[in-house]
Amino acid sequence: MAALGTVLFTGVRRLHCSVAAWAGGQWRLQQGLAANPSGYGPLTELPDWSYADGRPAPPMKGQLRRKAERETFARRVVLLSQEMDAGLQAWQLRQQKLQEEQRKQENALKPKGASLKSPLPSQ
């Protein structure tokens, strides 16, 4: 049984993504394009055909899916940005309150006279 397993195992062709599969990816990124040519761009975003009278073709499933993914991503970015802004404002308000409390403690009236000379009562 083990021999059969090794025969089947060695008979399987291994497919992998090598460096050659990503050839040109770095150049495309430097040019402001997608690393993968089918990632985004006119070939994936524009319709494949149009009507003879010039009307655009209805959007395909892939286009609708990509549009929905982009919308969800944009909504998530806006939500996280708003959360960051709210957190930053709360932190700044907290820092202002702490500074104000510290300033009040520094500017508080200091005891003078006999209370300074006499030792503090022990409890």
UniProtKB/Swiss-Prot annotation:
The terms describing its cellular component in GO are: mitochondrial inner membrane; mitochondrial large ribosomal subunit; mitochondrion; nucleoplasm
Q: Does the keyword Calcium apply?
A: no
Q: Pfam families, alphabetically? A: MRPL52
Top-level taxon in the UniProt lineage? Eukaryota
Q: Give the residue spans that cross the bilayer.
A: none
Q: Molecular function terms in GO for this entry?
A: structural constituent of ribosome
A GO BP term here is: translation
Indicate the residues annotated as transit peptide: 1-23
Main localisation? mitochondrion
Q: Where in the cell is it found?
A: Mitochondrion
Q: Which residue intervals make up region (Disordered)? A: 99-123
**Family matches, as InterPro entries:** Ribosomal_mL52
The protein's UniProt keywords, in alphabetical order, are:
Mitochondrion, Ribonucleoprotein, Ribosomal protein, Transit peptide
**Biased composition range(s): Basic and acidic residues:** 99-109
| Assembly mode | Component of the mitochondrial large ribosomal subunit (mt-LSU). Mature mammalian 55S mitochondrial ribosomes consist of a small (28S) and a large (39S) subunit. The 28S small subunit contains a 12S ribosomal RNA (12S mt-rRNA) and 30 different proteins. The 39S large subunit contains a 16S rRNA (16S mt-rRNA), a copy of mitochondrial valine transfer RNA (mt-tRNA(Val)), which plays an integral structural role, and 52 different proteins. mL52 connects the central protuberance to the body of the ribosome.
Q: Please state which protein family the record places this protein in.
A: Belongs to the mitochondrion-specific ribosomal protein mL52 family.
Q: What is this protein called?
A: Large ribosomal subunit protein mL52
Q: What gene does this protein come from?
A: MRPL52
